[in-house]
Structure formats: structure tokens, C-alpha cells
């Protein structure tokens, strides 16, 4: 079994492409189902506003990497996506998910939300049986190591997130938010986080709209001061607010330029969604100040030097965790070969036990003794080779001997 991650992320991919290859829940299910049918053993998809990554485990890794690359282009109908796709195999793939989980590969270095997103990606694949032993262990270990690294190095001592940066950008442009009015569209994790930040800023009014009304009712219980508005009437409130934050999971635009043309006051729009919620050209309107996820990168750079120093320190810890996982992967290869050898011994034992019992009439006790003796003798023959296999450390040697055993025994 080999591992790989194939995908795109903010490092070299503009938002115009990222939003086109972002997986909705239904798309994630279709993608995993399709790729499993193509022979890939295990799949986990991590899809956020900054990355779209497919982690795979396979016996035919190179051909299945090509399968995933072609899948991206065909599934999303984006011809140019190949220009941006990155591929990492085995140890590099393992290192990548460890860095991602710890927030060390994030646009906002050390941000907190990615760990929850990685957990959700694992939960989804486990629940739908798209991942099994290898990827489940990889993601669990990555999550555990991320918690340790964040705690040990205090990378997230001050909670940092895309929402936090967006609020800081608002403060930079508006000054104090006290007495301002805001509207949040979207009551998911991002919208809820935005609300928590705004509640602390002493705004005059905060309006919340969401397509599913029940989700907003739950928010009202937690934040009784907010005012709920009907999703279909969201445009009517925009004349009366200073700030609009959008954070929906809609696959299409929910705010278009033409619907903002008559806004008279200065309106700051923070589009936290991917695909984007707000039409890009809306920012061309003189009194509309539109920001999307890529605009938040610059404001986070003030923390960058300190956080990059911490990420260099974290590298040693991550390397250690990666090496531990790779040792487990090596032992897994050996374990499969040992299992094959034991199964071959069992098959030979069953074959000869059947032959003997046809020739000699044995009672149940004698038959049981003979079975144990046959199986014990056969296992003794392979015991030393098995012990030698377990002691191998070098990956090339492991692969060489496993290949030889497989060829000799025709596994």
C-alpha cells in the first residue's frame, strides 16, 4: 500500500480556480464513490476555502494518481486545473497532512479552523466507509500531533482564524465597530464564529439570515440579542447596515452587483465563502468595499515572522511523528506478508490433514492433536524468515524481500 495527496491550495492557485474545484457534500460523495469504483482502496477529501485535496491509499499508486488528476479536470470541467495541481507521495504526503492539521500550511499560519476541518473530513470518510485502516490511522495521528504541537509551541495562543483576520481588517478600515450595524448571512461554523467575534465589539444591531431557519433559531438561543431576518428578504436589510459578512455553503452567488447598485451608505462586505457568495464586480461600486478570502492574507503577515519561526521549531516534532507513521507503514507491509505465510501454512495443514484422515480413521482427540502438530511444524519452518522480516529497517530491503517471498510462494 502507498499513499498520495493530489490537489490544489492557496499557495499557487488563485481563488477563481479554487472556488471551481471546491467540493460540496454531495460532490464529495460522488467523487469518493467514483474513485473507489476505479480501484482506489481508501479516500479522504479535505476541501476548505484554501485547499481542495484528495488523499488516497492504493496498491497501484502511480496509475491512481493519474486517475485523480484526470478526475479533477473532468469532474469540475476546469481545463486549466492541471496547471495548479500538486502531487505528494508516501512520506511527503504524510508530512503534508501533519503540517496542514497543525495550521503550518495555512494562509493564516497556525489558524485554528483547519484542525476541525481535518477532523470532519476523517469523520465523513469513516462514516461512509471511504477510508479504512491506513488513512484512518494517518488522520488520527495527524490530529493528535497537531494538538500536541499547538499546545507545546503555543502556536495558537491567540486564537487566529479567517474570521478573526476579517474582523481586524474591518477595524483597520472603519475604526471602532462600536455602534455599527452588521448582517451575517450563513449560520454554519464560519457564520457562528463571525457572530461570536462581533458580539464582543458592542455593535448596535446584528442581523442574521440563513436559508435553513432552524439553524438560526439555535443561534438565537445562544445569542438572544441578534435579530433574525428572512433569508429571502436579505437585500432589504442591506440599506440599513455598515457591514455584511457572508459565509454560506451555496454553490452559486447569493449577492449580485445589480442588487447593490442603490446602496447609499458605505458598505463593507466580507465574503468568507468558497465558492464566493458575492459577485466580484460588486466591488467596483464606489461605496461598496468587498473583500474575499485572498484579501485576508496581507493582514496576517504581521504575525508571519514569529509564526514561521515556530513552524521551524515544530518541524523537528513533525519529522519525528512522520517517521513513526512511516515505520508503522513498513511494519504493515511486513505484516501482510507474514499473514500470507501463515495462511499458506494453514492451507497446507488443511490439505494434508484431509488427506491423512481419509487414509486413517482417527477419533476427534487424535485428529485435534495431529492438526496442532502439523500446523506447529509448518509454522516452525517459516518462523525464522518471519523474525528476520520483522527486524528489517531499510525500506528498500523490506520491499526487496517481500517481493522475493511473494514470488517464491506465488502470493
From Swiss-Prot:
Active site annotation, chain numbering: 49
Query: Keyword Thylakoid: yes or no?
Result: no
Q: Which Gene3D superfamilies match?
A: Glutamyl-tRNA reductase, N-terminal domain, NAD(P)-binding Rossmann-like Domain
The Gene Ontology biological process terms listed for this entry are: protoporphyrinogen IX biosynthetic process from glutamate
Which CDD domains does the entry mention?
Answer: NAD_bind_Glutamyl_tRNA_reduct
Q: Which residues constitute the signal peptide according to the record? A: none
Instruction: Write out the catalysed reaction.
Output: (S)-4-amino-5-oxopentanoate + tRNA(Glu) + NADP(+) = L-glutamyl-tRNA(Glu) + NADPH + H(+)
UniProt xrefs under PROSITE patterns: GLUTR
Q: Locate the site labelled Important for activity.
A: 96
Q: Which HAMAP family does the protein's record reference?
A: Glu_tRNA_reductase (MF_00087)
What does the function comment of this entry state?
Catalyzes the NADPH-dependent reduction of glutamyl-tRNA(Glu) to glutamate 1-semialdehyde (GSA).
Q: Know anything about its domains from the record?
A: Possesses an unusual extended V-shaped dimeric structure with each monomer consisting of three distinct domains arranged along a curved 'spinal' alpha-helix. The N-terminal catalytic domain specifically recognizes the glutamate moiety of the substrate. The second domain is the NADPH-binding domain, and the third C-terminal domain is responsible for dimerization.
The UniProt entry's sequence similarity note says: Belongs to the glutamyl-tRNA reductase family.
Identification of the protein by name? Glutamyl-tRNA reductase
Species this protein is from: Clostridium novyi (strain NT)
Name of the gene: hemA
Amino acid at each position: 500500500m502507498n499513499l498520495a495527496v493530489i490537489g490544489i491550495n492557496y499557495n499557487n492557485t488563485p481563488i477563481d480556480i479554487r472556488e471551481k474545484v471546491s467540493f460540496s457534500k454531495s460532490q464529495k460523495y460522488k467523487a469518493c464513490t467514483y474513485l473507489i469504483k476505479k480501484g482506489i482502496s481508501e479516500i479522504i477529501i479535505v476541501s476548505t476555502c484554501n485547499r481542495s485535496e484528495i488523499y488516497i491509499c492504493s496498491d497501484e499508486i502511480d496509475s491512481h494518481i493519474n486517475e485523480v488528476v484526470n478526475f479533477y479536470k473532468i469532474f469540475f470541467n476546469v481545463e486549466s486545473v492541471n496547471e495548479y495541481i500538486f502531487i505528494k507521495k508516501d512520506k511527503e504526503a504524510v508530512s503534508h497532512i501533519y503540517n496542514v492539521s497543525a495550521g503550518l500550511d495555512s494562509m493564516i499560519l497556525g489558524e485554528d479552523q483547519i484542525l476541525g476541518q481535518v477532523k470532519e473530513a476523517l469523520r465523513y470518510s469513516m462514516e461512509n466507509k471511504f477510508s479504512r485502516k491506513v488513512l484512518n490511522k494517518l488522520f488520527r495521528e495527524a490530529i493528535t500531533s497537531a494538538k500536541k504541537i499547538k499546545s507545546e509551541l503555543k502556536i495558537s495562543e491567540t486564537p487566529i482564524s479567517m474570521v478573526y483576520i476579517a474582523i481586524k481588517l474591518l477595524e483597520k478600515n472603519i475604526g471602532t465597530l462600536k455602534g455599527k450595524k452588521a448582517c451575517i448571512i450563513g449560520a454554519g461554523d464560519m457564520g457562528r464564529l463571525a457572530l461570536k467575534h462581533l458580539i464582543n465589539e458592542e455593535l448596535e444591531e446584528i442581523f442574521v439570515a440563513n436559508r435553513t431557519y432552524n439553524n438560526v433559531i439555535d443561534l438565537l438561543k445562544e445569542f438572544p440579542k441578534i435579530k433574525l431576518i428572512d433569508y429571502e428578504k436579505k437585500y432589504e436589510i442591506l440599506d440599513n447596515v455598515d457591514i455584511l459578512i457572508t459565509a454560506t455553503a451555496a454553490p452559486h452567488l447569493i449577492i449580485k452587483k445589480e442588487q447593490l447598485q442603490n446602496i447609499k451608505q458605505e458598505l463593507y462586505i466580507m465574503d468568507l465563502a468558497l465558492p464566493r457568495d458575492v459577485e466580484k464586480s460588486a466591488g467596483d461600486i464606489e461605496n461598496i468595499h468587498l473583500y474575499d478570502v485572498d484579501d485576508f492574507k496581507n493582514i496576517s503577515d504581521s504575525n508571519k515572522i514569529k509564526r514561521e519561526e515556530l513552524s521551524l521549531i515544530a518541524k523537528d516534532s513533525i519529522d519525528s511523528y512522520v517517521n513513526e507513521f512511516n515505520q508503522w507503514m513498513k511494519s504493515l507491509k511486513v505484516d501482510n506478508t507474514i499473514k500470507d505465510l501463515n495462511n499458506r501454512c494453514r492451507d497446507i495443514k488443511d490439505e494434508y490433514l484431509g488427506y491423512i484422515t481419509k487414509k486413517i480413521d482417527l477419533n476427534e482427540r487424535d485428529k485435534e492433536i495431529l492438526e496442532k502438530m502439523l500446523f506447529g511444524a509448518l509454522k516452525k519452518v517459516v518462523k525464522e524468515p518471519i523474525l528476520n522480516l520483522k527486524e528489517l529497517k531499510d525500506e528498500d530491503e523490506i520491499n526487496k524481500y517481500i517481493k522475493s517471498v511473494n514470488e517464491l510462494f506465488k502470493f
